[in-house]
Design a protein with these regions (language model features):
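Short, flexible loop segments at boundaries between secondary-structure elements
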Residues: 91, 165-204
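A polyanion-binding, active-site-adjacent surface
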Residues: 1-163, 169-176
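A charged, well-structured terminal subsegment
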Residues: 206-210
């Protein structure tokens, strides 16, 4: 979303019928912590029609409107490597954007969140559990969750303890974080991780197509 006109057009749709309920929930989260930031969910996603939830840890820098090239949106079209890798995997698997929706386990932007030590990070994960169930409750067609990274996977385990019936009803797929730290390695390593991501996303595509 490096072109501001395109960004503004997309932002104009944040209360479109398919994402209205989710983004109104985002508004309630923003009101709870007015000094902090939660990105709206991009209307490129299927919103209430989504069958696949893309679960990452927390908003990236490019979700912030004030950031250079920022969109103010949770979107796989954001101009950062983490979003680009997920977008590429979705395209490779033939998953339409309207078949999925993104969410951050801790939805507020926290600078450097991914590098926090466990004792500083885990309270955020505990808080995210009860927020995630509110999101899933707004996704009646949800079939699967794709988790990116160790920290949101830990959050999912906490979620499973609190909401076992909901967790059991969903097929779960996993991959490392697609951000710069998650893909820190040699060219050969990054290519292997990319291949693994494609394979896992293909499996997710098969499940949501059933």
């Amino acid at each position: 979303m490096s072109v501001s006109a395109y960004r503004d057009d997309v932002r104009a749709g944040i209360y479109a019928p398919h994402v209205r309920e989710l983004n109104e929930y985002v508004d309630t989260l923003r009101a709870k912590k007015p000094k902090e930031f939660v990105p709206h969910i991009s209307p490129e996603f299927g919103g209430s029609q989504a069958r696949l939830l893309l679960l990452t840890l927390s908003p990236g820098e490019k979700t912030r409107l004030e950031a250079s090239g920022g969109s103010g949106l949770l979107s796989v079209e954001n101009s950062d490597p983490a979003a680009a890798r997920i977008a590429e995997a979705l395209d490779h698997a033939g998953i339409d954007r309207m078949d999925c929706v993104g969410w951050n386990f801790y939805p507020w932007y926290v600078k450097g969140f991914g590098e926090l030590e466990a004792q500083d990070r885990d309270p955020y994960l505990y808080e995210g559990v009860d927020l995630l169930i509110q999101v899933i409750a707004r996704l009646p067609r949800l079939r699967a969750v794709f988790i990116f990274g160790k920290a949101p996977d830990l959050g999912w385990r906490l979620f499973r303890q609190s909401y076992p019936k909901t967790a059991r009803s969903l097929k779960v797929f996993r991959h490392r974080s697609t951000g710069p730290v998650g893909y820190l390695g040699s060219v050969e390593q990054r290519m292997e991780w990319r291949r693994e991501l494609f394979e896992e996303m293909n499996k997710a595509a098969a499940v949501i197509a059933q």
